[in-house]
Regions:
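Sequence/structural segment immediately N-terminal to covalent heme-attachment motifs in c-type
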Residues: 64-100, 185-215, 233-236
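Extracytoplasmic electron-transfer domains, predominantly the class I c-type cytochrome c fold
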Residues: 36-37, 47, 66-71, 75, ...
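Carbohydrate-binding/catalytic loop surfaces
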Residues: 281-293
């Protein structure tokens, strides 16, 4: 069975595994846990995504948990200002995960709490949600690993759990796989992209692409790294087509979105140490701009900028288990 197939099986069976484990504990005085698991399984069977809405900021409770949730939301909104040692670019979490992580066309975070742990082909391992958050810190924010045991990580996870309220374990909501896949298979033109950029993007991101206090840099030392999803042409085109310009999203054609993506990603940007070990089983998407197993780089940027502390930018991959024996991937 393929890794993708195992991931599908895992997601479909997690609610029932949880219920079975809780029932097994019932004889040890864990009847409350069993009842909770049965309730979770019942909710999974009756969950209707079309009528579900994520909680809003106004719904955050006024207690200790609510305080952690609010801190987590603040960290998403003001990431480099709050965590300058870990988010060293000009991007915030909400630069990509718009509407505080709830916008379906902008890599929504809703439901993430219910989907992890899960298998990630890029890392070739099953990872937890804290590791997935750190992939954003080290790649999309071109920063450093946020300690998983830190209060800040706990606050971020509290917020992700909050906006996933009532989503059944293992359930994939719309947008769960990240940015919406573009239906058109197009090739961006850098020269055309520059023209569109000058016409539609400079008001926020400036002619030099370095952005402003409110809008992030799109290339250079304070932008996303080559290891970020946004450094891939099709992924960037999807984000641009669905969400940009912010004042009139959806006004560009798919070809214009690909052209702008090609132009933006042709510029220098931070390196992503360890990127050559991505997709260890092969199968990297066609538009990945760096070499991996069996994959040649697709239109790499003009140059890569060295990271100040490369040893702090790599999220440790969980050990692979074969027949009960652990081995490093």
């Amino acid at each position: 069975m393929t890794d993708a197939a195992w991931d599908t099986v895992l997601r479909r069976t997690l609610p029932w595994i949880a219920a079975a484990l809780a029932v097994a504990c019932q004889g040890s005085g864990k009847s409350a846990s069993a009842a909770t698991a049965r309730d979770t399984a019942a909710k999974a069977a009756t969950f209707v995504e079309a009528s579900w809405r994520p909680p809003t900021e106004a719904d955050i409770p006024h207690d200790s948990l609510g305080a952690a949730i609010r801190r987590g939301l603040y960290l998403l909104r003001f990431t480099p200002e709050s965590l300058p040692a870990y988010a060293t670019s000009s991007l915030r979490c909400t630069s990509c995960h718009q509407n505080d992580g709830t916008k379906a066309s902008a890599a929504p975070l809703t439901g993430a709490h219910a989907r992890y742990p899960k298998y990630m082909p890029r890392s070739g391992a099953v990872i937890g949600l804290a590791d997935r958050v750190n992939y954003c810190f080290t790649r999309s924010l071109a920063g450093n690993v946020l300690p998983p045991e830190s209060r800040q990580m706990n606050d971020i996870l509290a917020y992700l759990a909050f906006i996933s309220h009532d989503v059944p374990v293992g359930r994939d909501l719309a947008g769960a796989s990240g940015l919406v896949t573009m239906k058109d298979t197009l090739v961006g033109d850098i020269a055309r992209g520059e023209a569109v950029f000058k016409r539609e993007c400079v008001a926020c991101h400036q002619a030099d692409g370095q952005g402003t206090a409110a809008f992030p840099a799109l290339w250079g030392p304070r932008s996303f790294s080559i290891g970020a999803s946004m450094a891939r042409e099709e992924r960037a085109a999807s984000f641009i087509w669905h969400n940009m310009p912010q004042s009139k999203p959806g006004s560009l054609t798919p070809q214009e979105a690909f052209d702008v993506a090609a132009f933006v990603n042709s510029h220098p940007r931070p390196d992503s140490p360890g990127k050559e070990t991505d997709w260890p089983s092969g199968g990297a998407p066609q538009d990945v701009p760096y070499a991996t197993k069996g994959h040649a780089p697709h239109r790499p940027p003009a140059s890569l900028l060295a990271r100040r502390t490369p040893e702090r930018t790599i999220v440790p991959t969980p050990p692979v288990v074969h027949g009960g024996a652990k081995s490093e991937p």
